[in-house]
Amino acid sequence: VLSVIKFKTEEEVISLANDTRHGLAAGIFSKSNSRCLRLSKAIHSGIVWVNTYRVVSPIAEFGGFKNSGYGRESGFQAIYDYTRPKTVWMNMSDEPASNPFVMK
């Protein structure tokens, strides 16, 4: 199903696109790259496809805005949901650190 809506100004189409409780995805088709960039920044959705639709990749984050969900799936950020990052600083020399508050 494809929904096509006529509009006269970019402000009008942004208002129409954002006038919903949901914001999972949007698709923009235009010959103007600058228009696509402006619209993709202004539309409140978790993913925006430009001159294509439903292209996915496991390294791209996926998730919505508003009532379409909180958080993201996939992508590098998802790895952090399953890990506990920890920083360990270790003196590898045989000498004790001269001042533990000075990083070398």
Predicted regions and their residues:
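Conserved C-terminal structural/oligomerization subdomain of aldehyde/semialdehyde dehydrogenase
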Residues: 1-104
